[in-house]
Amino acid sequence: MDKRIAYGIVIASFAFLQACTSPTKSEAPKAAAPAAAPSGSATDEIARYRAMIADGNPADLYEAAGEEIWKKPMGPKNVSLQKCDLGKGPGVVKGASAELPRYFKDTNKVQDLESRLVTCMVRLQGYDANEIITAGFEKGKRKDVEAVVAYVVANSKGMPIKVSIKHPKEKEMYELGKKSFFFQGGPMDFSCASCHAENGKRIRLQDLPNITEQKGAALGWGYWPAYRVSSGNFWTMQRRLNDCYRQQRFPEPVYISDNTIALSMYMAYTGNGGTVETPGLKR
């Protein structure tokens, strides 16, 4: 069977499952109170379905495109990204995302994978940072960033999450992320902790990991970026966080802003020791 057709069948099947189990758009998302899931529950069925199709993750297509973009000379300077230093030396992608976010001396900043790739695209290839930041997801050069993210994170799959807060700026970013995680506000008086600070919570049929604990943080951080079946595309962590802000009815965060990187630092460091399973496959 043609691989594209197989992917189409997988996507359609999962989309149908989602349509049958999701409320209408007019319903506001609510975190269900902790409850014991019965044997053979829909949650268990979804878990089995994910395991069944794990070898056919459509994120593989983004990964292949990202590898090509990484190696191809592009931009005003017509150079590739193969000299981009993601923290383990110029051009090294193996294991890089497992140790991000981290402090980079050349920018004097803590950066996540996406902000670091933007730095490389600006410095090495000559692109305009503002054009990437304001482009929107899946648009312009931001789309290239997303594809390269898929390529890079796939090269850490199976490795342990190993994020440091030894540098003062890393520690500062971690504390900012923790504060942001528990900050409560907006018209719904929500925070990240409203959904992700207790065990046993669910929204619709989706289990909500407790990000304040190592196991939950590893599940949350370790499986993103991921292919999102319900939307039919690949979501980076920046996009995942952007959608969390939307669900809380907060203003949309600026792409690769300090606050989004800080939240990533908090989640990643809390999940240290867990396994990187990216790119994941999500509802």
Regions found by a protein language model. Name each.
Residues V148-V152, I165:
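Hydrophobic, well-structured mid-protein blocks that either form specific transmembrane helices
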Residues L17-A19:
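C-terminal motif of bacterial Sec signal peptides marking the signal peptidase cleavage site
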Residues M1-G8:
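Bacterial N-terminal signal peptides that target proteins for export
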Residues P29-L61, K71-A147, K157-G158, F183-R283:
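Electron-transfer interface patches adjacent to heme c in soluble/periplasmic c-type cytochromes
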Residues A51-E68, G158-K178:
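Short, charged low-complexity linear segments at domain edges
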Residues T21-P23:
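Bacterial signal peptide processing site
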Residues A12-S13:
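Repetitive helical segments and hydrophobic/amphipathic motifs
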